[in-house]
């Protein structure tokens, strides 16, 4: 079916804003940016907020799986940015019911609670944080766009729950006057990152990064946090009747596809780490990690060094076009990868040193006899 084109010139003010996951990496950066732009913001998270007090900021601590708490969170709100999620990168038939239910309760049930509460409260706009992995099914994707179908091959619960939740959010567009859209980031990085490079640093400090996985020509894209936030705000502003964004999904990234190891190399070298020289087969590593994951869930083995999805990102092309976001939202990355790296390299070096000192202290404590 042909999509009826909206008018990209139609935009709106955001009004009073709710940010879920406001204590997290993306959410906290989004809250800060919105406050800097003069918006009134309510930050909602189950974790305590570390944001400094601000006259335009209200902090609500609570659980998104509680419908009553969601009702309180959306009261008086005009625009919702939903960034809260559990990131579980293992999945498949071998996972336990408890592991699966935890992800679905937050990522799907929590999204449903929040959106329905917003509809009842008269919220006008809902921007959902999805993932580019919703279309990744183990194939090479070079410059893919939003016409790609959802994957039905799930290596991880994060992707599985994001597919279900994104479909739900977009299907609710226009219901009770609320307009919805979904943003599909790639790997999110920048000051405050506690996921992408932290996981890499953990592997380095444990001595696990001895080889490079996959071909050097395989590329992925990333989403610098302030480029992503720029995309969020543009999308919300375009959630207007007859506008371009209602009911749509958008890839938002830095538009600079790069091999993951080449992307990480300047960071690790700045941390004083030697760069591996040897390369090994990506599919072989994925096969080993998939089997290891089954042993983890069925027999209690330690978790695999890499999740199957993480391995695929190392040896398959998985990067996406931002042409639709450019056309519909006027999106262009605010920062190049080099500009962003210059800005946040001191943060990453500091994080690595902190983690190294913590690991050394733990090792020392473990060797001290009681």
UniProtKB/Swiss-Prot annotation:
Inhibited by EDTA, zinc, silver, copper, and activated by magnesium and calcium. A competitive inhibition is observed with NAD at concentrations higher than 5.6 mM, and with trilostane (3,17-dihydroxy-4,5-epoxyandrost-2-ene-2-carbonitrile). It is found in: Cytoplasm. Optimum pH is between 8.5-9.5. No catalytic activity is detected below pH 7.5. Keywords: Cytoplasm, Isomerase, Lipid degradation, Lipid metabolism, Multifunctional enzyme, NAD, Oxidoreductase, Steroid metabolism. One of its GO terms (cellular component) is plasma membrane. Its EC number is 1.1.1.145, 5.3.3.1. The keyword Membrane does not apply. CDD domains: 3b-HSD-like_SDR_e. Its main location: cytoplasm. GO terms for biological process: lipid catabolic process; steroid biosynthetic process; steroid metabolic process. Pathway: Lipid metabolism; steroid biosynthesis. InterPro entries: 3Beta_OHSteriod_DH/Estase, Lipid_A_modif_metabolic_enz, NAD(P)-bd_dom_sf. Belongs to the 3-beta-HSD family. Monomer. This is 3 beta-hydroxysteroid dehydrogenase/Delta 5-->4-isomerase. It comes from Mycobacterium tuberculosis (strain ATCC 25618 / H37Rv).
């Amino acid at each position: 079916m042909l999509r009826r084109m909206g008018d990209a010139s139609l935009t709106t003010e955001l009004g009073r804003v709710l940010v879920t996951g406001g204590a997290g990496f993306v959410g906290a950066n989004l809250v800060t940016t919105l406050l800097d732009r003069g918006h009134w913001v309510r930050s909602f998270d189950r974790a305590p907020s570390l944001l400094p007090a601000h006259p335009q900021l209200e902090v609500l601590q609570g659980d998104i799986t509680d419908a009553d708490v969601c009702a309180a969170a959306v009261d008086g709100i005009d625009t919702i940015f939903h960034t809260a999620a559990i990131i579980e990168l293992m999945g498949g038939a071998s996972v336990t019911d408890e592991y699966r239910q935890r992800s679905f309760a937050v990522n799907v049930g929590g999204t449903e609670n929040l959106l329905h509460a917003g509809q009842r409260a008269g919220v006008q706009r809902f921007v959902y944080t999805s993932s580019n992995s919703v279309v990744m099914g183990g194939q090479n994707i070079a410059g893919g766009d939003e016409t790609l179908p959802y994957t039905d091959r799930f290596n991880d619960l994060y992707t599985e729950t994001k597919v279900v939740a994104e479909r739900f959010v977009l299907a609710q567009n226009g219901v009770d006057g609320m307009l919805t859209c979904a943003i599909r980031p790639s790997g999110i990085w920048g000051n405050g990152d506690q996921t992408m490079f932290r996981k890499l640093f953990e592997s380095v400090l444990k001595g696990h990064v001895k080889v490079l996985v996959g071909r050097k020509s395989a590329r992925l894209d990333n989403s610098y946090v302030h480029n992503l936030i720029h995309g969020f705000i543009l999308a919300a502003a375009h959630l207007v009747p007859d506008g371009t964004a209602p009911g749509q999904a958008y890839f938002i990234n830095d538009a600079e596809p790069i091999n993951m190891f080449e992307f990480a190399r300047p960071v690790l070298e700045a941390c004083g780490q030697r760069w591996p020289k040897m390369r090994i087969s990506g599919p072989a590593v994925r096969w080993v990690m998939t089997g290891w994951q089954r042993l983890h869930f069925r027999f209690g083995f330690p978790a695999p060094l890499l999740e199957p999805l993480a391995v695929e990102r190392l040896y398959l092309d998985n990067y996406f076009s931002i042409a639709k976001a450019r056309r519909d939202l006027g999106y262009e990355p605010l920062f190049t990868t080099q500009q962003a790296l210059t800005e946040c390299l001191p943060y990453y070096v500091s994080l690595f040193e902190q983690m190294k000192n913590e690991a050394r202290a733990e090792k020392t404590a473990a060797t001290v006899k009681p």
